[in-house]
UniProtKB/Swiss-Prot annotation:
GO terms for molecular function: 4 iron, 4 sulfur cluster binding; iron ion binding. Involved in iron-sulfur cluster biogenesis. Binds a 4Fe-4S cluster, can transfer this cluster to apoproteins, and thereby intervenes in the maturation of Fe/S proteins. Could also act as a scaffold/chaperone for damaged Fe/S proteins. PANTHER family: FE_S BIOGENESIS PROTEIN NFUA, IRON-SULFUR CLUSTER SCAFFOLD PROTEIN NFU-RELATED. Binds 1 [4Fe-4S] cluster per subunit. The cluster is presumably bound at the interface of two monomers. InterPro entries: Fe/S_biogenesis_protein_NfuA, FeS_biogenesis, FSCA_dom_sf, HesB-like_dom_sf, NIF_FeS_clus_asmbl_NifU_C. Keywords: 4Fe-4S, Iron, Iron-sulfur, Metal-binding. It comes from Yersinia pestis. This is Fe/S biogenesis protein NfuA. The lineage of its organism: Bacteria, Pseudomonadati, Pseudomonadota, Gammaproteobacteria, Enterobacterales.
């Protein structure tokens, strides 16, 4: 369910050494399954463990997850990254905003999941987003761009070289991707 790298485990172990004996960590999602979902990690003293929690045992510690957060933390990864600027803890939870869909789910749901969990987080860096409007009987995914993508001069490259390539690779049943956005360039546009 959750991967905690050795570097992150070592970091947590150092922090936990200064806490009450038996304290572990809790990984959680606030507003799971919504666009405002946020993940977090906190200390979990022994008296804060609930009977409904899932305990994930790692080499150096245990992580507790409340039952509501469990499905939204599938495939999550916690790492401790060090570079020239310093060190930071990273928590990637691709399913926090939208629960992972089954491979047998309808094509529309599977495409929507990929857009929300993989494409939109990349577009969000530019204040943009994309929404699946429909999948035509001919197998075309009809998308609408919003935010910083609306009116952006790079939207065609993003559509063809990024989104379309990724969707066609993941979903061979799709024949292409089309943009139905009426682009209006303005201050909101990224480029």
């Amino acid at each position: 369910m959750i991967t905690i790298t050795d570097a992150a485990q070592s970091h947590f172990a150092k922090l936990l050494a200064n806490q009450e004996e038996g304290t572990q960590i809790r990984v959680f999602v606030i507003n799971p399954g919504t666009p405002t979902a946020e993940c977090g990690v906190s200390y979990c003293p022994p008296d804060a463990v609930e009977a409904t929690d899932t305990e994930l045992k790692f080499e150096q510690l245990s992580a507790y997850v409340d039952e509501l957060s469990v499905p939204y933390l599938q495939d999550a990864e916690i790492d401790f990254v060090t570079d020239q600027l310093g060190s930071q803890l990273t928590l990637k939870a691709p399913n926090a905003k939208m629960r992972k869909v089954d491979d047998s789910a309808p094509l529309m749901e599977r495409v929507e999941y990929v857009l929300q969990s993989q494409i939109n987080p990349q577009l969000a860096g530019h204040g943009g987003r994309v929404t699946l409007m429909e999948i035509t009987p001919e197998g075309l995914a009809i998308l609408q761009f919003g935010g910083g993508c609306n009116g952006c001069s790079m939207v065609d490259v993003t559509l063809k070289e990024g989104i379309e390539k990724e969707l066609l690779q993941k979903f061979p049943e799709l024949k292409g991707v089309r943009d139905l956005t009426e682009h209006q360039r303005g201050e909101h546009s990224y480029y």
